[in-house]
UniProtKB/Swiss-Prot annotation:
Protein name: Inactive glycoside hydrolase XLP1
InterPro entries in the cross-refs: ConA-like_dom_sf, GH11/12, GH12
Example of a GO MF term: cellulase activity
Top-rank lineage group of the source organism: Eukaryota
Protein purpose: Secreted XEG1-like protein that has lost enzyme activity but binds to host soybean apoplastic glucanase inhibitor protein GIP1 more tightly than does XEG1, thus it outcompetes XEG1 for GIP1 binding and frees functional XEG1 to support P.sojae infection. With XEG1, is required to elevate apoplastic sugar during P.sojae infection.
Location of this chain's protein in the cell: Secreted
Glycosylation sites: 174
Similarity section: Belongs to the glycosyl hydrolase 12 (cellulase H) family.
Length: 189
């Protein structure tokens, strides 16, 4: 089976240099090799609130961006949005990808209430180059406030070792896409 990969690099970096923020539901900004999305895909899960995202700095293959939000009402663990930085690249078959070099720094601040979030790489695959997303692979680097994986059973389906890191693997639906997700930090390093 041929598999093609679209990579969404999820990076949250807070810096002091800022450009104009964008706040509408599907607004995006193109910056170098990246597209930054505000992505309020499930904003109706909150009774009210808003979110704004902005690009702070772009230098070569490095990007810094930030997101600010206020959500009230709704379940704290219900995802409201997924701001992200997506790397723009030519689609490739997974078997032709030898490595995906990456480096990420992120920080967050939270003043009150419940803070539930994850920091992750999010990859989408299809069996054809022109196909829609069939599978989503989320690689969680951090989970806060009880954020948990998408799972049909609530239990890991396997333990996967990549290099010297072991991850619990979860599987579940995200609409019509099947998600495979090793959440949180590695079990061992």
């Amino acid at each position: 089976m041929k598999s093609f990969l679209q990579l969404v690099v999820v990076v949250a970096a807070l810096l002091s240099v800022s450009t104009a923020d964008f706040c509408s539901q599907w607004r995006l900004s193109k910056a170098g090799k990246y597209v930054i999305y505000n992505n309020l895909w499930n904003k109706n899960a909150a009774a009210s609130g808003s979110q704004c995202t902005g690009v702070d700095k772009i230098s070569g293959s490095t990007i810094a961006w930030h997101t600010s939000y206020t959500w009230t009402g709704g379940a704290a663990t219900e995802v409201k949005s997924y701001s992200n930085a997506a790397l723009v690249f030519s689609k490739k078959q997974i078997k032709n990808i030898k490595s995906i070099p990456t480096k990420m720094k992120y920080s967050y601040s939270h003043s009150s209430g419940t803070f539930v979030a994850d920091v992750s790489y999010d990859l989408f695959t299809s069996s054809t180059a022109s196909g829609s997303n069939e599978y989503e692979i989320m690689i969680w680097l951090a989970a806060y406030g009880g954020a948990g994986p998408i799972s049909s059973t609530g239990k890991a389906i396997a333990t996967v070792t990549i290099g010297s890191n072991s991850f619990k693997l979860y599987k579940g639906p995200n609409g019509s896409t099947t998600v495979y997700q090793p959440p949180g930090l590695p079990l061992s390093t």
